[in-house]
């Protein structure tokens, strides 16, 4: 899980979702998991 000011899709499997006001990236590749913080 990477915590970043700006989250971006890193590959075509990445999806940007908003959960409880937090922007997250979910992906089949665990290295691509991110959240905004």
UniProtKB/Swiss-Prot annotation:
The keyword Electron transport does not apply. GO terms for biological process: translation. Pfam families: Ribosomal_L36. GO terms for molecular function: structural constituent of ribosome. One of its GO terms (cellular component) is ribonucleoprotein complex. SUPFAM superfamilies: Ribosomal protein L36. The keyword Ribonucleoprotein applies. Keywords: Ribonucleoprotein, Ribosomal protein. PANTHER family: 50S RIBOSOMAL PROTEIN L36, CHLOROPLASTIC (PTHR42888), LARGE RIBOSOMAL SUBUNIT PROTEIN BL36C (PTHR42888:SF1). Belongs to the bacterial ribosomal protein bL36 family. This is Large ribosomal subunit protein bL36A. It comes from Actinobacillus pleuropneumoniae serotype 5b (strain L20).
